[in-house]
A protein has these predicted regions:
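Interdomain hinge/lid region at the active-site interface
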Residues: 149-218
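Rossmann-like NAD(P)-binding element
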Residues: 1-33
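Long, positively charged, glycine-interspersed low-complexity recognition regions
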Residues: 220-231
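Internal alpha-helical scaffold of NAD(P)-dependent oxidoreductase catalytic cores
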Residues: 79-165
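Rossmann-like NAD(P)(H) cofactor-binding subdomain of soluble oxidoreductases
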Residues: 20-73
Length: 231
């Protein structure tokens, strides 16, 4: 299936990228481009490296688009519109990178170049940690006593419903994300834990000024996201 392809996209959980690359690379034609859509990049670069050929253009990438649904049926026409698609140039030829970027912008996306390490740090905070928090909050609800759990579900407000949507994401995919971006996720989780402890102390000691100051700062992040067209 890949023998005549000019571009091959590995759209599988990050834990499977290396294995799939090993299977298909021998059959790809010379000069073809290989990319992926994984949410962790250091592990993908590491896992694909042993199987690469000198005549294949390897351009790891990550489209920042999608929903809690997965698989071919989860796609829709405007999925990539105005969404960032991160490219990791590595050692690829500039002309090949530009051609790939043209393909991406043709889908409606905006391209951005990053290194593997920087990508994984950014995504640890903007994507991976929020998913971990969502899984934890919904898991806490699951473990409540029956009556309380039922009422939590029955009277769930928009905030909790948003968490349940995120927590409905594919468990295998996210298992692989956390195991393969463990260093960056743990670093961001430590920072989050310290900030959470700060909030805990502020609530305990009725320090409303500290709470209000934090909430005011975080509103600016929301406004920045809207201004950037990433709402």
């Amino acid at each position: 299936a890949v023998a005549d392809a000019d571009l091959v996209i590995l759209a599988v959980p990050v834990g499977a990228v290396g294995r799939i690359a090993e299977q298909i690379l021998p059959h790809m034609k010379s000069g073809a481009v290989l990319t992926d859509t994984g949410s962790t990049k250091r592990s993908v670069v590491r896992d694909v490296a042993p199987h690469l050929r000198d005549d294949i253009i390897w351009l790891p990438s990550h489209p920042l688009a999608g929903t809690e649904h997965s698989g071919p049926g989860a796609g829709f026409e405007s999925l990539f519109d105005e969404r960032y698609w991160i490219i990791l140039p590595l050692d690829a030829d500039e002309a090949a990178i530009v051609r790939f970027e043209s393909f991406i912008t043709g889908l409606g996306s905006v391209t951005e170049r990053m290194s593997p390490d920087y990508h994984d740090k950014v995504l640890a905070l903007t994507s991976h940690l929020p998913h971990l928090i969502a899984y934890t909050i919904v898991g806490t609800a699951v473990d409540l006593e029956t009556q309380l759990k039922n009422d939590v579900i029955r009277f769930s407000a928009s905030g909790f419903r948003d968490f349940t949507r995120i927590a409905a994401s594919d468990p295998v995919m996210w298992r692989d994300v956390f195991l393969n971006n463990d260093t960056a996720v743990l670093e961001m989780l430590q920072r989050f834990s310290e900030d959470l402890s700060y909030l805990q102390r502020a609530i305990r000691w009725q320090e409303g000024d500290k709470l209000e100051a934090l909430f005011s700062r975080t509103r600016e992040i929301r406004r920045s996201i809207i201004d950037a067209g990433q709402d």
